[in-house]
Amino acid sequence: MEGRVQIPFMKETPPLLKYLLGADSGQKGSKFRKNIRAYNSMFAFTSMGGRVDASINQSKGPFVFRMSGQNYHHIGSLLPEVGKKPQFAQLYIYDTENETDNRINTLLKHGTKTEIDHEILHELSKMLDQHNNLVKSFRMARDRYKTQPESTFCLRLLNSRTRDGRRYNMPTFSEVTGLIVGDFSEANFQRDVIIEHRTKGLRRITDLHPSFMPMTYPLIYPYGEDGYRPDISLRDVTDSPFKRQKLTMRQYYCFRLQQRLMRDTLYFKLVDYSNNI
């Protein structure tokens, strides 16, 4: 990358995640690592869309996930439709008194309910409540819904950032989201994602939005850090033969996944765990 990529390192992994991913976490950590994708999906704000071909698994052999066409992610409204159960982002706002059970129930159709540890799920929820700015924003919407259930409001996920992406990947609380009360026009918000109060449809969220990755993989971005942003400039290097001035998505993830001495980050723990499966 010729030294042209400059983005901040990820923050130190929260103690709970570091413990669960470590070799000294015993049976508890083993349960978590075995079902880490299920735990992440229970806290994800978005759902994956696309044409999944299930016929490939009708014969004997290892499981294969095959998708035709484009892969994309959706996000629904803040509150579920009347008579329906909450899912994904709605779990942070609606019926939070039964939040743990509601999250486990989302996995019923996948047959993994009995493998989920209630204690681990509760501890992860507390960890995200404490550290994750996106979760805090949705909890703010929950509090407004509880105190003013009759009011109509939306949550705005801001696309733009005011600070240099080469130095900061932790946006301030005001840079992440904002509550919109009453009527609004989406034309005023350009590429921001507007999560409406209660609607029937789903809204696609682009993978170029800074909050796309932390909303899809909250256990990899436990602080709600920004993911890739197309507006991050490359570092100026004297006599560089390259004309491109902005960071590409490929360069971003190459930098993130590069092993570095004395850097014990969540990315590397997940890579080490994957190599030992």
Predicted regions and their residues:
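Non-catalytic interaction regions
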Residues: 1-277
